[in-house]
């Protein structure tokens, strides 16, 4: 009887040990802004349990960066709509922040896709973020806009965005496009 109880206790103990996310991943998923999450990912990347957790962490970075992108693009759209209606759209757009967020979202999305397509701890590839590929691919157009925005202002940044656009055409993550 003692052996059965001991075996059941060991089974419960091992199943709970492997059931949830690691502590570093939980901290990354709780982060409320991109800078905080990026620092956590950078400092704890080697502590994440496997490729699935790394993909989850980079997906969280992508989501946080896209909040800024969507917010600023919403303001741009609202300003354009106001102009078309004959009113003055005068809400300020943080273009520098927008394109920084575009770059961060693109890079985080590519990393999430990369880790998502790597074998898990069992040696099997089970992509969970397949829908992310199309969303990240669409950000390539914003890389061009970022390069154009920085032309004449900051040549290094302009080159960075335009070069990223050109180089990303050959990324294996985007082979289906």
Report each predicted region and the residues it spans.
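Alpha-solenoid helical repeat scaffolds
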Residues: 42, 107-110, 160-166
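C-terminal segment of classical bacterial N-terminal signal peptides
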Residues: 14-18
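Single-residue signature of alpha-solenoid repeat helices
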Residues: 37, 102-105, 158
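Sec-dependent N-terminal signal peptides
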Residues: 4-13
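Start-of-domain marker
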Residues: 19-77
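Extended alpha-solenoid helical-repeat scaffolds
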Residues: 156-162, 177
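Short coil/linker segments at helix-helix boundaries
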Residues: 64-153, 169-176
